[in-house]
Amino acid sequence: MDCCGIFHIRTDMSKSLFTVIAVATAMLVCSNATAQQTDGFPYPTVPDTLRTAETRALYVMEHYWDRFNFADTTLMHRPETTEQGFANFIDLLPRVAPSTATLGIKALADHLYNIKTGKKDDSKTPELIRDYFATLTEKYLGDSESPLHNDLLYAQFLDIMAANKFASMAERTRNEYMARNLKKNLPGTTATDFVYIDRKNQQRQMHNLKAKYTLLYFYDPDCDHCHETAAQIAAMPETSSPAISVLAIYPYSDSEMWKTKKSRLPSTWTEGYSPDGQITTDDIYYIKSVPSVYLLDEQKRVVLKNPSITLLQNTLKKLTATAEK
């Protein structure tokens, strides 16, 4: 661990193993160290009078952003300070009590909606800063390749931002819409059923597909990245297991285009399209981009939602090993 950050920003970041006590202690150490420098994130100094892990974690969450200068737009161009501090903040949230995490997010929202620039020429600064933090939030919580990817936490962020009394109507509407979609088909919930038409022009129900595990793969035949990802999935030995069925669905409305495309997917996969693109036009599933992947269990409960390829394969290895015993 670096004294000035719980982990470094990098593409292969892994979850730190801190307990709440270690988190609070680490933040105290970091705050003392950063007090002596000018280029690091200004972590809060935890009072010595706070002895329990819970009170120390609560203090860190409530005061994490107190010493950060939100009016300084140059900090948007210093990822070693701002992005590092934000990434560490995101990493802490699942490690503290949910109520404590909520207070931390609310404190950040209050700062973002109370930026004082002091100059008339800087009237756009608050919006620029909020947009910057919105981009960071999407990067760390919304990107399936991020080790901190968490749709539920992302939705909580957006809900809290939307609920701030200083949020504009446009901000509130946008954040509420995004949060509502992110909450659809979360891990642990039953995946919403839908109708699809298969390659034999037969109408089917997703829930009627009999399989120990279903890999639901939303794709577009004109999407190169979709074919690259499909090839990676097909190369996994686990997807050849009788315990796994792959259902590849075109979720958009141009079904005639889909019908004219020769399949490039494995013959063992079930393919189909959503009639009239109902999956997306009716917001049955929130598909921000394709490919979009869900792993479902036998009862069609969501096990994984848009996992990284590595997480998907590791999970399939465990599940197929158990299923085949």
Could you describe each region identified by the protein language model?
Residues 36-201:
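Oxidative protein folding and maturation machinery
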Residues 227-263, 277-281:
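Structural microenvironment flanking redox-active thiols in thiol-disulfide oxidoreductases
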Residues 245, 268-270:
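Conserved beta-strand segments of alpha/beta enzyme cores
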Residues 1-40:
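Bacterial Sec-dependent N-terminal signal peptides
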Residues 277-317:
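Thiol/disulfide oxidoreductase modules built on the thioredoxin-like
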Residues 205-230, 246-247:
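Short active-site neighborhood of thiol/selenol oxidoreductases, capturing the structured segment around
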